[in-house]
Amino acid sequence: MAESNKEAIDSARSNVFKESESLEGTCAKIGGYDFNNGIDHSKLLKSMVSTGFQASNLGDAMIITNQMLEWRLSHDEVPENCSEEEKKNRESVKCKIFLGFTSNLISSGVRETICYLTQHRMVDVLVTTTGGIEEDFIKCLASTYKGKFSLPGADLRSKGLNRIGNLIVPNDNYIKFEDWIIPIFDQMLIEQKTQNVLWTPSRMIARLGKEINNETSYLYWAYKNNIPVFCPSITDGSIGDMLYFHSVSNPGPGLVVDIVQDVIAMDNEAVHASPQKTGIIILGGGLPKHHICNANMMRNGADFAVFINTAQEYDGSDSGARPDEAVSWGKISSTGKAVKVHCDATIAFPLLVAETFAVKKEKASKVNGF
């Protein structure tokens, strides 16, 4: 009996204290920032990768984004038939970066972060929804305010106030928007009829960016820096409302916006990116996420990918899909580097930019003596 009990205890001990396979040298050790060392925001952000959970995913996103920014064609093996001139130019060939975001992020203060990126030409292609276009212009005309998620809808409606999460947009803002945009539509229609101008969503957005002429607008900077902005859902929002009311005032063949030409232009951004690598940063899900990923499928996948959203994959939505699902479609390269950060982009994206784009901009300014 004693022998049997000893065997049982030994077995239990063996189960409880099962010998581990060594992780030394194969995995990063977990440890957070030590505030005894003082307050150093850059070191704090760098410590995210070893903190664990979504902090580590955010840290990985920072690393991958910096890899996008640092990649040069000269890092890759030189092909045998490469001319001397081509060899010299390889250092100047950078990664093409696609940035996608949903409209609520322009309603929020992330707009200013995106404006910074477009102002300094840090991204190459933008994709958003209609709200991501109109809210940028509306903010040049009137303010959005901080409210509460719990404000009663019926009460707000009676006061002419619209709620976006815990943001409040007075309905008067849209009246100002109509007063601003309708005369531009009138002129666009004249140019369509007299000059055979073919308007596409991206061409219309560039025109509006020119007309707003306001440095707080990311679309102004996109126009100024010739950064294409694609929005295949251009009618799904206040701009669609304005197009509808404009058509009522202009019966017959009114203003035409051709989305097919933009599909061609968007796909060509990816198809003809080579020899560049492509990187994608997508805030939120829905149309911007799929549109960017689908274009990159044309080149057998993006080389770098960062997703930041709170959507889950369990309903089969594209919004919630992890990067590995995109790999199965050829939207992210099977050899690419990708991460999803499960976090509100209003928290994660400014932190990411602080430790990637902004750091590199600051270093470049110091080198150039600015």
Curated annotation (Swiss-Prot):
Names of the cofactor(s): NAD(+)
Catalytic activity: putrescine + spermidine = sym-homospermidine + propane-1,3-diamine
Alphabetically ordered keywords of this record: NAD, Transferase
Disulfide cysteine pairs (residue numbers): none
InterPro entries assigned: Deoxyhypusine_synthase, Deoxyhypusine_synthase_sf, DHS-like_NAD/FAD-binding_dom
Pathway: Alkaloid biosynthesis; pyrrolizidine alkaloid biosynthesis
Pfam families: DS
Any one GO MF annotation of this record: homospermidine synthase (spermidine-specific) activity
Assigned GO CC terms: cytoplasm
Assigned EC number: 2.5.1.45
Subunit structure as annotated in this protein's UniProt entry: Homotetramer.
UniProt function note: Catalyzes the transfer of an aminobutyl unit from spermidine onto putrescine. The resulting polyamine homospermidine is a precursor in the biosynthesis of pyrrolizidine alkaloids.
Family the UniProt entry places it in: Belongs to the deoxyhypusine synthase family.
Protein name listed in UniProt: Homospermidine synthase
Source organism per UniProt: Senecio vulgaris (Common groundsel)
Lineage summary: Eukaryota, Viridiplantae, Streptophyta, Embryophyta, Tracheophyta
